[in-house]
């Protein structure tokens, strides 16, 4: 069962790889040196075959995924999740970022002064 779960998780990446390979194969078959290029209508037919085959392969997976994740698209659930996430993580992001930047600057300056020879970095007060 674990193998099936992993294979379902890898399905989108696999579909993308198949699409890329199909496009590369279609492009390479047209790019052989020394062979005349097929007429434009044949190129269009090849590409339409690739598109229709990919649609045929991917449409059931996309439909199943959409049906499984339909609850996520319910606006009230999604809105509640986003509001909670904002309240928990993003509300005070500005002040936290400013504090972190100031602390980082101070730490970096302290490290720089500690590495600097005393003759070059002494205060001239």
UniProtKB/Swiss-Prot annotation:
* Keyword hit for Transport: yes
Q: Name one Pfam family in it.
A: APOC4
Q: Which residues form the signal peptide?
A: 1-27
User: Domain of life here?
Assistant: Eukaryota
- UniProt keyword list: Lipid transport, Secreted, Signal, Transport
Localization recorded for this chain is: Secreted
Looking at the UniProt entry, the stretches that span the membrane are none
A GO BP term, please? lipid transport
Query: Where, if anywhere, are coiled coils annotated?
Result: none
GO cellular component terms?
high-density lipoprotein particle; very-low-density lipoprotein particle
Q: What does this protein do?
A: May participate in lipoprotein metabolism.
Report the family membership: Belongs to the apolipoprotein C4 family.
Q: What is this protein called?
A: Apolipoprotein C-IV
From which organism does this entry originate?
Ateles geoffroyi
